[in-house]
Amino acid sequence: MELPRLENVDLSGKRVFLRVDFNVPVENGKVTDKTRIEKTLPTIELLIKKGARIIIASHLGRPKGQVNPEFSLAPVVETFQSLVKSKVYFSKTVIGEDAIKLSKELKNGEILVIENVRFHKEEEENDPGFSKKLAALADIYVNDAFGAAHRAHSSTEGIARLLPAYAGLLMHKEILELSALLHKPARPFVAIIGGSKVSTKIKVLTNLFDKVNHLLIGGGMAYTFLKSRAIPIGNSLVEKEFEVQAFQLIEKAGVAGIDLQLPVDHIIGDQFNEKAKTKSVDKMGILDGWMGMDIGSKTVSNYEKIIKNAGTIFWNGPMGVFEMDKFASGTMAIAKAVAKSKAKTVVGGGDSIAAINKARVADKITHISTGGGASLEFMEGRKLPGVEALKKKTSE
């Protein structure tokens, strides 16, 4: 997939509208995880070096089209300022005369961050008038927000049709790494899919089916698969309406010669909190009144053997309720096994990234994808509006 590149474009003195994904966790007015900000710094540094005047736009949370101080980018700007050498200004408005004036006053290499684009309901409606007002802030558009590329919004799609548009360095890297997984993975290709719901992962499981050699399933979604095979799951999370599809996937894997593995033992709890009593149970199933909260040691051992011999690994979704220390050991063990593997490793999804960081092995992973929903949709084989809008520019 060829996307228009920034590297050879003369940007000196040009106002560049840079869409980034600064949708980071903020607690008590402080950013608690800078990963997404840091990932886009190479693009920002390239623009500074080229003498561009940079207008940065992002969303934060879901303010539902209204100005809400809780979702202001102000604390994010504070963190961002400490990561770049250039002068950084903050516009309390997104569009209009004040924002345009600030954008025109920028000197080469300086940065203006505009307020949360989702403070305007027109952003998520991809309203043409709003896209035009965003385009008035700049001469050139660059999209480096892979994490929002699956949304057809004004700042990710609409504006790209109004200005010369390019992909940022992070956007390129994401597309390159994820495309390689789908088209030419080193074998054996192992996909580790976890998380709480089958409903959110069924499409990616289906698309990966004819590409992987091993499919390792964990997290809350595993219990829908186990229930479909009449294994007792007690009070564990289950999506009844997906039992048939789960059963069909197991059958299909058998026919296709894909090694689909489910947990053979579990760490269970009598309630969904840190105070829960815990037990370890094996394949006989989970007792009534108890719920599966993590994969057990036999499952970890089974999965580790497969991970050790992999050529390529894609991991999306934790193996259990890893936010609670009592139920984190399965996810932590898998994180460490993936990090230790000699395979090319790609990890996507907020929870999996948090697990990798918690296990302190982020530096051992080949590629950490910043796009949760976007990387899943890409792995489902779907077209991403934010990427398609950039491609259109090259063919026009």
Curated annotation (Swiss-Prot):
Any single GO CC term annotated in Swiss-Prot or TrEMBL for this entry: cytosol
Keyword ATP-binding listed: yes
Location(s), subcellular: Cytoplasm
Listed GO biological process terms: gluconeogenesis; glycolytic process
Enzyme class: transferase
Annotated EC: 2.7.2.3
Catalyzed reactions: (2R)-3-phosphoglycerate + ATP = (2R)-3-phospho-glyceroyl phosphate + ADP
Pathway, per record: Carbohydrate degradation; glycolysis; pyruvate from D-glyceraldehyde 3-phosphate: step 2/5
SUPFAM superfamilies: Phosphoglycerate kinase (SSF53748)
Lineage top rank: taxon: Bacteria
GO molecular function: ADP binding; ATP binding; phosphoglycerate kinase activity
Keywords from the named record: ATP-binding, Cytoplasm, Glycolysis, Kinase, Nucleotide-binding, Transferase
Binding sites annotated in the UniProt record for substrate: D21, F22, N23, R36, H59, L60, G61, R62, R118, R151
Ligand binding (ATP): K201, G292, E323, G349, G350, D351, S352
InterPro entries on file: Phosphoglycerate_kinase, Phosphoglycerate_kinase_CS, Phosphoglycerate_kinase_N, Phosphoglycerate_kinase_sf
Quaternary organization: Monomer.
Family: Belongs to the phosphoglycerate kinase family.
Protein known as: Phosphoglycerate kinase
Organismal lineage: Bacteria, Pseudomonadati, Spirochaetota, Spirochaetia, Leptospirales
